[in-house]
Structures are given as structure tokens and as C-alpha cells.
Regions:
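Intrinsically disordered, low-complexity terminal regions
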Residues: 1-224
Length: 224
């Protein structure tokens, strides 16, 4: 059996998180006054994971030379190392993910949040409370949100999905440039632009302004 070890890394004053990795990653984030970071992986994998904090940005990257990079590129679903990251933060204003990752964020309150996702996997918030939310999903992954925000700006640039039927938003602007799909709950204003063959489903009775390509679709699901 492969040995798994848990390593504690020192962090302080983190507000944004950036993850770059060829591994299979699980990242669990919760809100706490006591900041902490633990990583679970094999000893060899732990040696390659670099964590730095600079200007409030926590970067999680892979170290290694050209040989390591080649081996990373040749990994498959059967050989790809697995990493579990547990993170407790006082504040979260940015999440930038370019990796195969499953990310679970429990209840979190913040003034503003920027989500950037480019990779397979899923980002899920159990309950998000924010004034403003900006989302860019450029890959095939799923972003699933519940909670409440005042304003949100969503951009789907690939085949990914945005599932937010359980997150109330007063003002929503969404653009779909590929084959992505979104489900949202809008209360006051909804601006939709679809230039690909994707679709948007919405709940609620907002004032709707739309610009839809012939292959795109916009439909109302009804009230909550």
C-alpha cells in the first residue's frame, strides 16, 4: 500500500488562491479565524508541491525539472498522483484553478469573489454570501453554487457548466461563447449574450435583455 503523509504548511493573510498542477487534486476550503494549510500525498509528491504566499496570494505549484514535466504530461487517470489539500481562511476573494480538481467550499461570506476555472473537475460552494461575484469558466469543468449575491458576471468560454439555480442574484450578466450551459436564479435584472450553441436556463422574474445566436437558447424555468 502506498504511504500517505500529511504535511502542515505555514500561511498567513491569504485572500486569494492559485492552483497549478498535473495531479488529481481535492481542495477543501472553510472559513475560520485560524488560517491553516495541510496537504495529504505520498512523500515523493509532497516534495514537489511548492506553496508560497505573496501579497495575499497563496500559490500551489509543482516544482521539478524537464524530466518531471515530461512524466507529468504522460500520466493517465490510472497513474496520476492524488493530492488532498485542506485550507482554512479568514477571507477568500479569488480562486484561480488550472488543474484537474474537485473543490468544495463550505459556508463562506466575502465582499467580492473572482472565480477562474480552466480544467476538468468541479468547484462547489455549499453557501456563498457575497456582494459581487465574477466567474470565468474556460474549460470542461462544472461550477456549482448556492447562496446569495447582489451582482454576478459569468463568462462561459468552453464546454463547461455553471449551475447556480440555488444562488439568488439581484443583477446577473452572463455570456456564453462556446457550447457551455448555465442555470441561474435572477431576481431583478438579467443580461444574456450567447454567441455559440450553448444555453441559459433561468428562474425568477427579472427584466431580461438578451442577444442570442441562432444556435443558442434562453428559457425560463419558472419562479422559485
Amino acid at each position: 500500500m502506498t504511504e500517505i503523509k500529511t504535511q502542515v504548511r505555514e500561511i498567513a493573510d491569504v485572500q486569494r488562491v492559485r492552483l497549478r498542477s498535473q495531479y488529481a487534486n481535492e481542495l477543501f476550503i472553510d472559513q475560520s479565524e485560524d488560517e491553516s494549510l495541510t496537504i495529504e500525498a505520498t512523500p515523493r509528491v509532497l516534495e514537489r508541491i511548492e506553496t508560497t504566499v505573496d501579497g495575499g496570494l497563496l500559490s500551489i505549484d509543482l516544482a521539478g525539472g524537464i524530466g518531471d514535466r515530461i512524466r507529468d504530461a504522460l500520466t493517465t487517470s490510472l497513474t496520476r498522483p492524488h493530492v488532498v489539500i485542506r485550507l482554512s481562511l479568514r477571507q477568500l476573494r479569488g480562486l484561480d484553478i488550472a488543474a484537474l480538481a474537485y473543490i468544495r467550499v463550505r459556508r463562506f461570506e466575502t465582499d467580492t469573489l473572482d472565480l477562474l476555472f480552466n480544467g476538468p473537475g468541479e468547484i462547489e460552494f455549499d453557501h456563498l454570501q457575497a456582494d459581487t461575484l465574477s466567474v470565468t469558466n474556460s474549460g470542461p469543468g462544472m461550477i456549482r453554487l448556492a447562496g446569495q449575491v447582489s451582482q454576478q458576471d459569468v463568462s462561459l468560454r468552453g464546454p463547461g457548466e455553471f449551475a447556480a439555480r440555488d444562488m439568488l442574484s439581484k443583477q446577473t450578466r452572463i455570456s456564453v461563447n462556446g457550447i457551455g450551459n448555465a442555470t441561474i436564479w435572477a431576481e431583478e435584472q438579467l443580461d444574456v449574450t450567447i454567441s455559440g450553441i450553448g444555453g441559459v436556463l433561468y428562474m425568477g422574474s427579472p427584466v431580461v435583455r438578451s442577444k442570442i445566436s441562432p444556435m443558442g437558447s434562453l428559457a425560463r424555468l419558472g419562479d422559485r
